[in-house]
Swiss-Prot record:
N-glycosylated with N-acetylglucosamine (6.7%), N-acetylgalactosamine (0.6%), galactose (1.8%), mannose (4.6%), N-acetylneuraminic acid (1.0%) and sulfate-containing glycans (0.7%). It comes from Gallus gallus. This is Mucin-6. One of its GO terms (biological process) is negative regulation of cell growth. It is found in: Secreted. Multimer; disulfide-linked. Residues 1160-1178 have a biased composition (Low complexity). Residues 257-312, 619-676, 737-782 form the TIL domain. Its main location: secreted. Residues 1160-1185 are annotated as: Disordered. Keywords: Disulfide bond, Glycoprotein, Repeat, Secreted. PROSITE patterns: VWFD. GO terms for cellular component: extracellular matrix; extracellular space; intracellular membrane-bounded organelle; supramolecular fiber. Glycans are attached at N223, N930. The gene is MUC6.
């Protein structure tokens, strides 16, 4: 519906009429509703131009008047503007407002003169009123009221809405003007100039044109018809008709274009820019100034001129770089080329960190958390001399099972044994050594009061933070690439296989991965099933308050936000503060970890400790604190033997040291050079953690308290042959007792046990190894572990990408010919990239999920997948409303629980599999990609892709190179410091507003949190227990809680069920089929299709006379059996041992049941509602001759 000129109108039903009035009128609204979805009003001035427009969209009110736009509670705004699902931006020579919410879409356009247009959805047919009519599809009844046909003025009087302080008298009724026929031919000719072949009916526009000419100050002047010709041009453009450049300098000119732009009557509003030169959209053309063909708008520099792509500048951290400029970042050098950064990777050391008691970050930047009490292999490598191995000791540090923390680092080789703990260094014979210490190629010294450094000549550097929390940082040179194993990962640039176990298979959860690298006979690591902050609201508030300094604006940490994303450090800080009884040491440790990361990027955060009272450091012995210090030239010992302490680090070290010109002596006092002493031999003292045994009870010294185990009995009676009992009190053959009992798990690690204390117990006889069920077996009979299950000799398993065979306790794996990776978009803005990076955002725009053709030379993309996200909760969370898949000239749109296909591409093969719960698209781009796209008809969308080319992929789904470290690569090819900067770069529509923060819906809707946590707890329950060891459940549980809190404008249970279904699907991808739905919890009514049939092509269902009981719900197809398609839950009409073959279009039997897997261990119960869908085979061998 539109109005233009001095008072021309065209209703929703295309009825044209004329009316001139200066009162405030309702242009269009939803009738008979107290709170309509929209209410648009307008007022004309005495000059007949539109003086004011009021647009009410629920609580949002936009007022347009006198060339200004204001928003209630915001004030006057600048364009482009985006907030609360509303976008306002220039659109050629006009201004366009687009309101996109989950339940509504509306477009309003105006030109600040005489033109106003509203475009609404068909669902409002028959429900509107105002000057735009009733929108019922019949143009002749728009003026009917209570059964009577009204004239124009009486109809308009009904739409009048006075301002609160006015009474606007209705205009006097005048006789409608009759158009002069003498202008009819001229007007037809003028309209033909605009578009001679346009299918929009011309009669009404000819009439409006005639009226314009006769009402002109000089009757018959053609220039008086410009507004009607412009409206006809707009109507033709909206109908996708050809429109010519009909304006001239002297006829209906709209003025000159700025810079080097040119005028187009029908130009694309999808402006191609340096930031997004491939921008495309479905909007119709409009008139205005545009860049000439072959150029793009420079939206990066300030001049906003049209340039060739080669002339586009680049941007980085708010700075603009000219084409050809170079910049250096950590481990890469980049050159600005066609608006993108063309980067080359440089040799770079690998870094692994152990922080915050329980957090580990691998060489390939994968972060995880675990809670175990044991000695673990941190890193083993063939590049370490003398069979060197780096280990980490984790001990209990509190009462709860999750209060575990790093207590010591061990370096072991055939030549050295070095144990570094809090301010102590032990060597081979548990002898305490005073620092500095040197042994061959290894030098250990204190860099400051807080850090100990181990420097080697073979490419390994270890820096240990001793206070406030014991932490370790490992650095290895590039020669170690692809040659490491252990908790620090395999350093091959691929994040996805960092959980490679000692048995040579990749696990799905951190605890199982960590357990495989135990260097002692310890209990398995335990999972923290609940958020520690959920146990105390006071602790939660305190943790969030203190840790929020990391993310707040105006703090010392803000200066680093553009370089290092503070969000993961904030989350760690909150977790540590709630998990550990000693809160502030862990808070300060978390803040220090962020500051250290910033300093590694060249940004030292001076005085950050002063911003938190409990984090300040008090130095003793007249030492001074520095954020960048070193031991060299600061100790007396460094004067006589500089090689012991003069080894700088590439990351600044903080702590206490002597001021320049002073040196630390043996009393930890700073003295002048002339007063430096000579050191005496190390003093003797008893080590902590030694044990004593009295009457069969063994006690250990832990944190100043005795912790005792055992009972008065003869323990040797519990040992059954071939095991034997070894006592710590009288054993001569093994002074560490059962601590180093030979196990199959230890055999898989390939190293010797590194004991820390003696334990009495039963051990296997020589040559035998203890397996998972406690039996002693020869090494060739050792089982393999995967996903918490045990597999015997010769058994095979199939993972997503490999076929693995168990041999001598280790997996021997062969890569499958085709391996896919998955990107998930689900719920309220959750994304998991192809390489496993997780993030959440609340963007209200169209975003590129994935596309190819991302190289600097910008080849044409063969596919592009775009999500349209809109606001779906009062807290501001956003969800995906539609998905657009572009395959060359072929387009597939997913929206409103259905799909549409337009265009053709003979090079692409695709088929559609329909299910009551999902739509699945199999797409083959020959020579490039095999894709399966799965949509649950709501907010969840999955892209499974395998490729036959090294073509680069980009978008919100990451770059699919196996390394999540660089997944936040922006459109201009540099790696963003945080997810929001990354997300903003992948907007498909550059006029959308940027996202500046992530909403926490549980904080905004606290009354929903308890319900959300209760309903989502099924993910942590016994129902999903069989999957807990295959897929880390905590991210899915947290996403479920967030979505359940945020989904507050209807469909809250649907949001919760969708979130749980995502975890169930992740389990199914790992071969675990979970039957989790019930008639009371997230039910699916597949039985409906047994008694209802489609009535025709319209798709409506009606009750059938016959009842067919074949349709039923299944959580998967062919559980524990072979199935050749992507396995998803749904409504199926095949029997339980059949599946529907889409090629043969009939039910086919599942493959034969494979050999059963070994039962789970006692610590891993199996739910009766669970079955394993992974293929398990048994490898057979020929009998001996």
């Amino acid at each position: 519906c539109s109005t233009w000129g001095g008072g021309h109108f065209s209703t929703f039903d295309k009825y044209q009429y004329d009316f001139t009035g200066t009162c405030n009128y309702i242009f269009a609204t939803v009738c008979d509703e107290s709170s309509p979805d929209f209410n648009i009003q307008f007022r004309r001035g005495l000059d007949k131009k539109i003086a004011r427009i009021i647009i009410e969209l629920g609580p949002s009110v936009i007022i347009v008047e006198k060339d200004s736009i204001s928003v209630r509670s915001v004030g006057v705004i600048k364009l482009p503007y985006a907030s609360n699902g509303i976008q306002i931006a220039p659109y050629g020579r006009s201004v366009r407002l687009v309101a996109k919410l989950m339940e509504m879409e509306l477009v309003v356009m105006w030109n600040n003169e005489d033109y106003l247009m509203v475009l609404t959805e068909k669902k409002y047919m028959g429900k509107t009123c105002g000057m735009c009519g009733n929108y019922d599809g019949y143009e002749l009844n728009d003026f009917v009221s209570e059964g009577k046909l009204l004239d124009t003025y009486k109809f308009a009087a009904l739409q009048k809405m006075d301002d609160p302080s006015e009474i606007c008298l209705s205009e006097e009724i005048s006789i409608p003007a009759i158009p002069h026929k003498k202008y009819a031919v001229i007007c037809s000719q003028l309209l033909n100039l605009v578009s001679p072949t346009c299918s929009v009916p011309k009669d009404g526009f000819v009439t409006r044109c005639q009226l314009d000419m006769q009402d002109c100050s000089e009757p018959g002047q053609k220039n008086c018809t410009c507004s009607t010709l412009s409206e006809y041009s707009r109507q033709c453009a909206m109908s996708h008709q050809v429109v010519f450049n009909w304006r001239t300098e002297n006829f209906c000119s709209v003025g000159k274009c700025s810079a080097n732009q040119i005028y187009e009557e029908c130009g694309s509003p999808c402006i191609k820019t340096c930031s997004n030169p491939e921008y495309s959209c479905s909007s119709h053309c409009t008139y205005g100034c545009f860049c000439p063909e072959g150029t793009v708008l420079d939206d990066i520099s300030k001049n906003r001129t049209c340039v060739h792509l080669e002339q586009c500048p680049c941007t980085l951290n708010g700075e603009t770089y000219a084409p050809g400029d170079t910049m250096k970042a950590a481990c890469r050098t980049c050159k600005c080329t066609m608006g993108q950064w063309n980067c080359k990777e440089l040799p770079c050391p690998g870094r692994c960190s152990l922080e915050g008691g329980s957090f580990v970050t691998t060489f390939d930047s994968r972060s995880y958390r675990f809670h175990g009490v044991c000695t673990y292999i941190l890193m083993k490598s063939s590049s370490l001399p003398h069979n060197g191995t780096l280990m980490a000791i984790y001990e209990k540090s509190g009462y709860s099972h999750s209060e575990t923390s790093l207590s010591a680092i061990i370096y072991l080789s055939t030549k050295d044994k070095i144990v570094i703990s809090q301010n102590e260094l032990l060597t081979d014979d548990d002898e305490l050594k005073r620092l500095p210490y040197k042994s061959g190629d290894i030098t250990i010294f204190k860099q400051s009061s807080m850090f100990i450094q181990m420097h080697t000549e073979f490419g390994l550097e270890l820096v240990v933070q001793t206070s406030p929390v014991f932490q370790a940082y490992v650095k290895v040179s590039a020669q170690f690439q692809g040659r490491t194993l252990g908790l620090c990962g395999n350093y091959n640039g691929d994040t996805t296989d960092d959980f490679m176990t000692s048995m040579d298979i990749t696990e799905g959860t951190a605890s199982l991965f960590v357990d495989s690298w135990r260097a002692g006979n310890c209990l398995p690591a335990m999972e923290r099933e609940t958020d520690p902050c959920a146990l105390s609201q006071l602790n939660k508030i305190s943790a969030e308050t203190h840790c929020s300094i990391l993310t707040k604006k105006g703090t010392v940490f803000e200066t680093c936000h553009a370089v290092v994303n503070p969000t993961p450090f904030y989350k760690r800080c909150v977790y540590q503060a709630c998990n550990y009884e000693e809160t502030f040491p862990y808070i300060c440790s978390a803040l220090g970890s962020y500051a250290r990361t910033c300093s590694s990027m060249g940004l030292i955060l001076e005085n950050w400790r002063n911003s938190m009272d409990n984090c300040t450091i008090t130095c003793t012995g007249n030492q001074t604190f520095s954020y960048n210090t070193q031991a060299c030239e600061r100790t007396c010992l460094s004067l006589s033997n500089p090689t012991l302490e003069c080894h700088p680090t590439d990351i600044p070290i903080e702590g206490c040291n002597c001021p320049k010109g002073m040196y630390l002596n043996h009393k930890n006092e700073c003295v002048r050079k002339s007063h430096c002493p000579c050191y005496l031999e190390d003093r003797k003292y008893i080590l902590p953690d030694q044990s004593t045994m009295t009457g069969g009870i063994t006690c250990y010294c832990v944190n100043g308290r005795l912790s005792c185990t055992g009972k008065l009995q003869n323990p040797a009676e519990s040992c059954k042959a071939p095991k034997k009992y070894i006592s710590c009190s009288d054993s001569l053959e093994n002074k560490y007792g059962a601590t180093c009992a030979p196990t199959c798990q230890m055999l898989a690690t390939g190293i010797e046990c590194i004991p820390t204390k003696c334990e009495s117990g039963c051990v296997c006889a020589d040559g035998l190894y203890e397996n998972l069920d406690g039996r002693c077996v020869p090494p060739e009979e050792c089982p393999c572990e995967y996903g918490g299950l045990s597999y015997g000799k010769g058994e095979q398993i199939q993972t997503e990408c490999e076929i693995c065979t168990c041999r001598k306790g280790k997996w021997k794996c062969v890569q499958k010919s085709r391996c896919s990776s998955t990107c998930n978009l689900y719920g309220e803005g959750h994304i998991t990239t192809f390489d496993g990076q997780r993030f959440v955002f609340d963007g209200n725009c169209e975003y590129i999920l994935a596309m190819d053709g991302c190289n600097v030379n910008r080849p044409l993309s063969s596919f592009k997948i775009v999500t349209e996200n809109v606001i779906c909760g009062k807290s501001g969370v956003t969800c995906s409303r539609s998905i657009s898949i572009y395959l060359g000239n072929l387009t597939i749109i997913l929206r409103d629980e259905t799909y549409s296909i337009s265009g053709k591409n003979l090079q692409v093969k695709y088929n559609v599999k329909k299910n009551a719960l999902h739509l699945m698209f199999d797409i083959i781009i020959p020579g490039k990609y095999n894709m399966t796209l799965i949509w649950n008809k709501h907010m969840n969308f999955f892209i499974k892709i395998s490729r036959e080319t090294q073509e680069t992929i980009c978008g919100l789904c990451g770059n699919y190179n196996g390394n999540m470290k660089d997944d936040f690569e922006t459109r201009s090819k540099y790696v963003a410091s945080n997810e929001l900067e990354f997300v903003n770069s992948w907007k498909e529509n550059p006029l959308c507003g940027d996202v500046y923060f992530v909403v926490d819906p549980c904080s905004k809707n606290p009354y929903r949190k308890a319900w959300a946590e209760k309903t989502c707890s099924i993910i942590n329950s016994q129902v999903f227990s069989a999957c807990h060891n295959k897929v880390n459940r905590m991210p899915y549980y947290e996403a479920c809680v967030r979505d359940s809190c945020g989904c507050d404008i209807g469909g809250d249970c649907e949001c919760m069920c969708d979130a749980i279904a995502v975890y169930a699907m992740a389990c199914l991808d790992k071969g675990i089929c979970i039957d989790w739905r019930t008639p009371e919890f997230c039910p699916v009514y597949c039985e409906y299709y047994n008694s209802h049939r489609k009535t025709g092509s319209g798709g409506a269902y009606s009750y059938g006379s016959s009842v067919n009981c074949t349709w039923h719900y299944r959580p998967c197809n062919c559980p524990n059996q072979y199935y050749k398609y992507v396995n998803i839950e749904g409504c199926y009409n095949c029997s339980h041992d059949e599946y529907f073959d889409y090629e043969k279009e009939k039910c086919m039997p599942c493959a034969m049941q494979p050999t059963s897997v070994t039962l789970p261990t006692a610590t891993q119960p199996t739910s009766p509602s669970t079955s394993s869908a992974s293929t398990v085979l048994t490898e057979t061998t020929n009998p001996p001759v």
